[in-house]
Amino acid sequence: MSPAMSLEHRLRRRFLALLASALLLPNWAQAQDADATPAQEPTADAEALEIVMRADEIRFPRDSFQTEIAVRNLSAGEQNDERKFRVLSRGNENTIVLSTEPASERGQALLMRGRDLWIFMPSVSQPVRLSLAQRLTGQVANGDLARANLAGDYIPTIIGREELDGQAAVVLSLSAVDRGVTYSKVKYWVAEKDSRPLKAEFYALSGRLLKTARYEEFKDMAGRLRPTRLVLEDALRAGEVSVLTYETMRLRDLPERMFTREYLRRLEQ
């Protein structure tokens, strides 16, 4: 079996496992506690999973792509830092994040395979293992750039519907599938009409709100309307904000051999 077919097979199995979990979880919970509030109908969780998958495909293409991202970090409304990154992504499992500005950090790269993440630095002989939750810059965690697969990393349930900025929105609670993902829990607002992502709140394992995100300025990129501006606001320190601008995005054929430590070592030379 070719590497591409193998990856496709793994992704298909993962989706089926998630769908099965979404269908079976309410009945399992009810069986554990006969006195508990009756579980949601199975279709509710299946619907939630479908909504998150559609929102994922709006944020980023399902196929291989390249995007250029500018990150401005602000404190009390004043910009104190700006960085730029090039992100190369193949499906939901393989990503390279290259630092392009400032010049002093050029040559640094993050490599994600599945949920395994390494950083490569010209001054260090061996790659260093990182967590998706570690801070990359400002309010941006490594996983915010390297991992965009909410449908694969979280178990979603619908917890309500409300109006947000004049739009009818579905409100979802996303629970991490394990501790290896970027956030323990996410509260997610998705437009009911077209599944556009609107807002997210990201929580720590303790339940503490870490930061909020707003998806803004939808424009035609890589074949469909996508949010080109993401505003991340620190919930613990008022006025600390990071603004991500997706300057370009295009579909690009990216062979799997690119997403290896050996390939990135060659880029450093």
Region annotations inferred by a language model:
Residues 1-10:
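N-terminal secretory signal peptides that target proteins for export/translocation
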Residues 12-17:
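N-terminal export leaders
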Residues 29-36:
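Boundary at the C-terminal end of the N-terminal hydrophobic targeting segment
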Residues 43, 48-123:
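N-terminal mature ectodomain segment of secretory-pathway/periplasmic proteins
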Residues 49-50, 79, 147-158, 207-212:
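A short, amphipathic edge element
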Residues 72, 90-92, 100-102, 115, ...:
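Solvent-exposed coil/turn segments that connect beta secondary-structure elements
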Residues 126-129, 142-145, 149, 167-262:
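Gly/Pro-enriched, hydrophobic low-complexity segments
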